[in-house]
A protein has these predicted regions:
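Residues at helix-coil transition
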Residues: 74-75, 156, 199-200
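Long hydrophobic alpha-helical segments typical of transmembrane helices together
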Residues: 187-218
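Short, solvent-exposed turn/loop segments enriched in Gly/Ser/Thr/Pro and often Arg
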Residues: 33, 168, 211
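GST-like domain detector, emphasizing the conserved glutathione-binding G-site
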Residues: 1-130
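GST-like fold's C-terminal all-alpha helical module
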Residues: 98-197
Length: 218
């Protein structure tokens, strides 16, 4: 099997590097860099029409969407998925929850943080900040409190997202948890302990050495 990972710095594609290191599979990396506006290069659309990362070429076929990529390799290798039925359901749920529920308010928070610091005419800035503040108060902050409270409670009850064992659910959840810990306010001791636990894994360390961190340091 030939595997080529298109990796963008500070992106979800670190998940794929980590997965492949956990599975001890051979692969090559084509590195891409974000531009000065933190956007992916337009040329990425030459690899896949969406031009979004991760993009993984497997025997010439391009796979996208990190949850689908993790699921594909875990099923193919028969590893990193629970065998207990209840834990299987939890694993599947968190595989979808990470991007479907947790990431949207985090992305909105990031967008408005950039809006507040973006250069604009002085008479526009109070209006833009006022809009951002209203959306944060009515949507972003309540949504983050809800979801981060749920994540924190989950990790107070078990060491990993699916249960007692590390799985692809943990790899999938790492990006939003890391983003939340770097930006969101409040004490999250169980999230911090989980992050420390999973980032101590040799496979994660190898992936980070090759691809860098998931999110920029503030």
């Amino acid at each position: 099997m030939s595997v080529k990972v298109h990796h963008l710095n500070f992106s979800r594609s670190l998940r794929v590097l980590w997965l492949l290191e956990e599975l001890e599979l051979d692969y090559t990396i084509q590195s891409w860099e974000r531009d000065e506006n933190f956007r992916a290069p337009a040329a990425a659309a030459d690899v896949h029409p969406l031009g979004r990362f991760p993009m993984v070429e497997v025997d010439g076929r391009v796979l996208v969407e990190s949850g689908a990529v993790l699921d594909y390799f875990a099923n193919r290798e028969g590893k990193l998925k629970p065998t207990d039925e209840a834990e299987k359901l939890e694993c599947t749920m968190f595989l979808h929850y990470a991007e479907g529920s947790l990431m949207p308010p985090l992305l909105v928070s990031l967008i408005f943080a950039r809006l507040r610091s973006a250069p604009m005419p002085f008479f526009i800035k109070p209006i833009a900040r006022g809009i951002a503040d209203k959306i944060d108060q009515s949507y972003t902050h309540p949504a983050l409190d809800l979801h981060l409270g749920f994540v924190e409670k989950t990790l107070s009850e078990r060491p990993y997202f699916a249960g007692d064992s590390f799985s692809i659910a943990d790899i999938q959840m790492f990006y939003p948890v890391e983003a939340a810990l770097s930006r969101a306010s409040g004490e999250r001791p169980n999230m911090v302990a989980w992050r420390d636990r999973v980032t101590s894994r040799p496979a994660y360390r190898r992936a980070e050495a090759k691809g860098g961190k998931a999110v920029p340091e503030r």
